[in-house]
C-alpha cells in the first residue's frame, strides 16, 4: 500500500509541473500598474483584479467595482513564448509579443469618463 501512496504523490508532482500557471513577471506587473495608477489619478479607472491559470494571466481594469471589466490585459502562453493582448468588451483590440507596445495602445483607447 505504501508503494501506491508514493506513486500518487509522484503523479501529483508530475501534474503540478506539467500544468504550471502563467504569471506576470515583476517588471511586467510594475509597468501595468504604472499605467493603471496614472489613470486612477485622472479618475478614469477605479479598480483592478488579477487572475492566473495554466495558459494565461489576466489584469482586468474596472470603472467601478460593481461593473464588468472595462479593459483586460492578457498574457497568453503560445507555442514559442508569450503574447500580450488588450481586450475591450470581449473583443481583441491589440496583440503583440512586446508588453510596452500593448501598454502604448491603452493610451490610444478612448477613456470612459463619468
PLM segments and residue spans:
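Broad hydrophobic/π-residue packing in well-ordered secondary structure
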Residues: 29, 36-39, 58-59, 71, ...
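Intrinsically disordered, low-complexity regions enriched in small/polar residues
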Residues: 14-16, 38, 50, 61-64, ...
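Short aromatic-glycine-(Arg/Gly/Cys) micro-motifs in beta-strand/loop hairpins
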Residues: 4-10, 15, 66-92, 108-109
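Catalytic phosphate/metal-binding cores of nucleic-acid and nucleotide-processing enzymes, i.e., regions
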Residues: 1
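Well-ordered alpha/beta subsegment
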Residues: 96-114
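Negatively charged, low-complexity tracts enriched in Asp/Glu with abundant Ser/Thr
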Residues: 4-55
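Amphipathic, interaction-prone secondary-structure segments
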Residues: 45-72
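Intrinsic-disorder-associated interaction segments
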Residues: 22, 92-95
Amino acid at each position: 500500500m505504501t508503494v501506491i501512496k508514493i506513486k500518487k504523490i509522484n503523479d501529483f508532482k508530475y501534474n503540478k509541473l506539467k500544468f504550471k500557471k502563467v504569471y506576470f513577471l515583476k517588471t511586467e506587473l510594475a509597468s501595468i500598474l504604472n499605467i493603471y495608477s496614472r489613470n486612477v489619478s485622472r479618475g478614469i479607472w477605479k479598480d483592478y483584479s488579477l487572475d492566473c491559470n495554466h495558459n494565461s494571466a489576466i489584469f482586468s481594469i474596472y470603472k467601478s467595482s460593481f461593473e464588468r471589466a472595462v479593459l483586460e490585459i492578457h498574457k497568453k502562453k503560445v507555442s514559442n513564448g508569450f503574447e500580450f493582448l488588450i481586450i475591450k468588451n470581449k473583443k481583441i483590440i491589440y496583440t503583440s509579443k512586446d508588453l510596452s507596445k500593448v501598454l502604448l495602445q491603452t493610451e490610444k483607447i478612448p477613456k470612459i469618463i463619468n
